[in-house]
Amino acid sequence: MALFCLSLFEEKQKPPSKETRHREQVKKPLKKKDSGVQVAKRDDRRAQEQKRDRDRPRDTFMPDTGKSLRVAILIDDIGQDMNALHELLEINAPLSFAVLPRQPHSAEAAKRIHLKNRDVLLHLPMEPKSYPEDRPGNGALFLSMTDKEIRTQFQRNLETVPHAKGVNNHMGSRFTEDTEKMLVVMTALKEKGLFFVDSRTTKDSKAREAADKIGVPFLTRKIFIDNDHNYQASLENLTRWLEDPGMQGNGPVLFIGHPYPSTILAIRDAVSSLRAKGIEIVPVSKIVPQ
């Protein structure tokens, strides 16, 4: 995963003023009057686009609720800083949380999340391509492990994160590219009745292929909220797709972020904007295809 090992104790960034939060409306230059031929061509293109929209298959797992889109916001790397978790749980939206195993507050965090009726996921550490420079942490899965060692490691991790409904990978750019190892992981998930969320730390991930073969419910991340670790960039990542027709009508959207102070502020400010647009914020488990 393209996660940055940045301090969770970074000083809170002050949010910009309301004036700087809102994008300036840029006036469009006046266009020259189109000729009859240009108008005809434009109308023809518009008709073709409308036909493609009508013919596009609907997502079978997204019920028609009358809302334009549903989104889930998953917060990774939970289990180290309980103060950050407390702030996130105070946000008036059903955020979901991926808890790292074998951390000082893994079990406590999972229990608190569950008591708040929010989704808990096991944030499963996996070997990245940058290992050993970047270490995935306690309970990590490595390609050098036997199948039995992977299953044992997974079970021990799961025991430290109670109430988990699913699993997503922490790092794992190397591990998730190995089909055979991912089949071992998916088999373990199938036995526990868990779903898998691919954080997509590599474009060559074999997670979907393995999940489909074993029959594990699967979902993939659409957008990382906070790659830039910056309030304004995070806020724009949460809202910019609303202006992109290509992203709407293609099923639910999964955002993944981290418990950074700037991300917490961005999510808090984005929630009302999303709802004002008719967007429904839901737990991750509600948008996983079954």
Roles of regions detected by a PLM:
Residues 61-134:
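Active-site beta->alpha N-cap acidic-glycine motif
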Residues 74-78, 96-102, 168-178, 190-204, ...:
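Catalytic beta/alpha-barrel core
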Residues 79, 91-94, 101, 149-163, ...:
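Extracytoplasmic beta-rich ectodomain segments of secreted or membrane-anchored proteins
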Residues 135-136, 140-159, 175-181, 208-246:
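Alpha-helical scaffold elements lining the catalytic groove of polysaccharide deacetylases
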Residues 189-201, 259-290:
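C-terminal domain-boundary segment and adjacent tail
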